[in-house]
């Protein structure tokens, strides 16, 4: 992206090929969304990761899921997930317990406080998403989602 505003960027021209422009645009949009969403979640005493754990549990059967499944859905390590879960439990948003059939498995369960917090956040979060997707038709959203899924699938093949 050439510097169209003639701002002084220390000589940086920003010339990228179309492939890199696309990837940079995706990252910028993602980071901008995350920054804005973080501000919303912070008002409720949550980080982005903590909110996502609550969202996953709230949409799991009986509000429960294993710590392993939750970390896989979020694409984070088990160790990181353990820290996030401990903080959520300390603040009363979830309960952590061992599975009665296999004590090696840790179950996470959303509490009424966690469910209420998800409800309280919904309006602000939905308004933010609506702002980001303003002007996109449902078809354009579906096409963009499919395209981004393809990019993500290709990224998994790279590893």
Predicted segment positions?
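C-terminal regulatory/oligomerization modules of transcriptional regulators
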Residues: 1-14, 139-159
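Pre-recognition alpha-helix immediately N-terminal to the DNA-recognition helix
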Residues: 25, 52-56, 116, 143
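Short, hydrophobic-biased segments on the C-terminal half of alpha helices
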Residues: 67, 85-86
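Charged, amphipathic alpha-helical coiled-coil/dimerization segments
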Residues: 5-8, 86-145
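N-terminal helix-turn-helix DNA-binding core of bacterial DNA-binding proteins
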Residues: 35-77
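Short, locally clustered residues in the helix-turn-helix/winged-helix DNA-binding domain
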Residues: 27, 55-62, 122, 149
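N-terminal leader segment of winged-helix/HTH proteins
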Residues: 1-44
């Amino acid at each position: 992206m050439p510097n169209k505003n003639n701002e002084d960027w220390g000589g940086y021209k920003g010339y990228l090929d179309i492939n890199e422009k696309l990837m940079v645009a995706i990252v910028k949009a993602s980071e901008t969304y995350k920054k804005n969403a973080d501000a919303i979640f912070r008002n409720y005493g949550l980080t982005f990761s903590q909110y996502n754990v609550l969202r996953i549990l709230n949409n799991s059967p009986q509000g429960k899921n294993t710590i392993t499944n939750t970390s896989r859905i979020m694409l984070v390590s088990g160790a990181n997930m353990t820290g996030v879960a401990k903080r959520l439990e300390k603040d009363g948003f979830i309960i952590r317990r061992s599975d009665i059939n296999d004590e090696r498995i840790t179950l996470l369960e959303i509490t009424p406080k966690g469910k209420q917090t998800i409800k309280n956040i919904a309006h602000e979060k939905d308004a933010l998403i609506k702002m980001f997707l303003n002007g996109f038709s449902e078809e354009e959203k579906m096409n963009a989602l499919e395209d981004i899924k393809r990019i993500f699938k290709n990224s998994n093949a790279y590893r």
